[in-house]
Amino acid sequence: MARSAYSYMAMWYRKIGREVHERLMRKILIEWRKAPAIVRVERPFRLERARKLGYKAKQGVVVVRVRLMRGPFNRRRPDSGRRPKRMGVYGITAWKSWRQVAEERAARKHPNLEVLNSYWVADDGIYRYFEVILIDCNLPTIKNDPLYSGICGREVPRRRIIRRLRERQKKTIEYLKKTLLPRLKEAPSQQ
């Protein structure tokens, strides 16, 4: 059975070209570090992944690379005095995934575009990089495309990612309500 070029690209990215890939990535990541945090790019870095998620090389489809700081969910230490255990600094995890944060930042930077999808690109010692696929719903080439009708239809609300109207975000919020709210209600109030 014949395999597509995209399957070979994915295989090279995952397994075969690891040594070559590391040498290339070192140079690329040095350039990316010097660039701004949110940059529009001409074409996706991982073409096979972008095509799987709905990217097409046509007018109205934009790819943006987003750079995020790696590390835990850092919270500011309170100024007023209390014992260290009650500072609320350590052991806190963010409610959002890295990918969701990247999508939200890209959506804020480009308010006239809608987020289609996103994917991880690379990591280095300091940063984590994602590419976000955005589409312009006002263009007729996008409006008439059946692939994008679920995002650009009349009934679909605008700026879904900022308002947490995507399925992934709704599921996360529902899960947190199911798990955290009962615990908070059961906990004895300290008075």
UniProtKB/Swiss-Prot annotation:
Gene3D superfamilies cross-referenced by the UniProt entry: Ribosomal protein l15e
Keyword annotations of the record: Ribonucleoprotein, Ribosomal protein
Cellular component terms per the entry's GO annotation: cytosolic large ribosomal subunit
SMART domains with a match to the protein in the record: Ribosomal_L15e
One MF annotation (Gene Ontology) recorded for this entry: RNA binding
Gene Ontology annotations of biological process type: cytoplasmic translation
Signal peptide (residue range): none
Keyword Ribonucleoprotein attached: yes
PANTHER family per UniProt: LARGE RIBOSOMAL SUBUNIT PROTEIN EL15 (PTHR11847:SF4), RIBOSOMAL PROTEIN L15 (PTHR11847)
NCBIfam families, per the entry: PRK04243.1
Family, as annotated: Belongs to the eukaryotic ribosomal protein eL15 family.
HAMAP family cross-referenced by the UniProt entry: Ribosomal_eL15
Protein's recorded name: Large ribosomal subunit protein eL15
Organism: Pyrobaculum aerophilum (strain ATCC 51768 / DSM 7523 / JCM 9630 / CIP 104966 / NBRC 100827 / IM2)
Gene giving rise to this polypeptide: rpl15e
